Amino acid sequence: MTQASAKFIVVEGLEGAGKSSAIALIRDFIEKHTGLAPVCTREPGGTPLAERIRDLVKIADPSDPLCDESECLLIYAARAQLVANVIKPALAEGKWVLGDRHNLSSLAYQGGGRGLMPLVEAVSNATLKGFKPDLTLYLDLDPKLGLQRAAKRGELDRIEQQAIDFFERARATYLKLASEDEQIVVIDASQTMAEVHKDILAVLQAMAW
């Protein structure tokens, strides 16, 4: 595989959309077609510092509630670390990168869900400077169904405990942004896992390998 062929692919979706199984599928597909396992990342997280920030964002502290603006800025601090120290170096070495969430999550959750789009766009522009994935697969699912699925996994984290209208706004933002960007592909995550995986593979197989 040549350096020029390396790609950054991201899986996005609301809680319970099936990102983990989709990522496992894509990871195996990339390894089969390139002979190399991709560098897998998650957001927030993916570096020692970013993982500590993840805990601040995901774990509620009733004694010092995280305000929406702080949440947004912390997530971008983690993302800046990940992009600078993991994603860009991997791509420069010709390695494929597979991300569990990226900037689209902030646009949907903090921009749409929290109503902070001007702040999100400003911080995104300042930290990422136009850097974006080559392909984003957005697993679309009704928030009510997604939260039901998430609850079956165990205790919900701070983000997962938000009111349903937060997730409805986030979903609407995801879909709006997907309609404006051909590099974002919407996958119907209400289907069976087999059907979802079939749709994902169809997208991957259409790429130049």
Curated annotation (Swiss-Prot):
It is an enzyme of class 2 (transferase). Keywords: ATP-binding, Kinase, Nucleotide biosynthesis, Nucleotide-binding, Transferase. Its EC number is 2.7.4.9. GO terms for molecular function: ATP binding; dTMP kinase activity. It catalyses: dTMP + ATP = dTDP + ADP. ATP binds at residues 13-20. GO terms for biological process: dTDP biosynthetic process; dTTP biosynthetic process; dUDP biosynthetic process. PROSITE patterns: THYMIDYLATE_KINASE. GO terms for cellular component: cytosol. The keyword tRNA-binding does not apply. The keyword Secreted does not apply. Phosphorylation of dTMP to form dTDP in both de novo and salvage pathways of dTTP synthesis. HAMAP family: Thymidylate_kinase (MF_00165). NCBIfam families: DTMP_kinase. Belongs to the thymidylate kinase family. This is Thymidylate kinase. The gene is tmk.
